[in-house]
Design a protein with these regions (language model features):
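A short gly/proline-enriched turn/hairpin at secondary-structure junctions
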Residues: 29-43
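Short, structured helix-loop boundary elements
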Residues: 2, 42-45
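Absolute protein N-terminus
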Residues: 1-3, 122
Length: 122
């Protein structure tokens, strides 16, 4: 489990979407929850790939770092430190060059030796 998550995070940090999806189940479910609100969700590896590619242009740099990792049955929970620099002014009020340092957690579920569900919570 940990090696799949490490690979996913490493590829995310390198902005390599194809490699990021290499360890993901074809029927993967993804949700991003911010302040208790689901602001993005996908169903299937194709949709997740589209969202990941669209997100590449949001940040000129980005990095997720795993601060802790715990396995609970088929669920892995990672505490994440996120650092990014906004690439351009965004509709939500973030400005080009603004630095983001956030913390949150990512929950990963697994099926057939692959990541089958990802929930990012901040």
């Amino acid at each position: 489990m940990r090696s799949l998550v490490d690979h996913y995070i490493d590829a995310y940090n390198r902005m390599d979407v194809d490699d990021m999806l290499a360890g993901v189940h074809p029927d993967v479910e993804f949700r991003n929850i911010s302040a208790g609100v689901v602001n993005a969700s996908t169903s299937g590896v194709v949709e997740l790939g589209k969202l990941a590619r669209q997100s590449l242009s949001l940040f000129s740099e980005r990095c997720q770092r795993i601060e802790s990792f715990e396995v609970q049955g088929t669920l892995a929970v990672a505490s994440i430190a996120f650092h990014a620099v906004v690439a351009g002014d965004l509709p939500n009020g973030l400005k080009k060059g603004q630095v983001l340092n956030l913390s949150g957690r990512s929950e990963f579920e697994f099926r057939d030796g692959a990541i089958s569900r990802i929930t990012d919570i901040s």
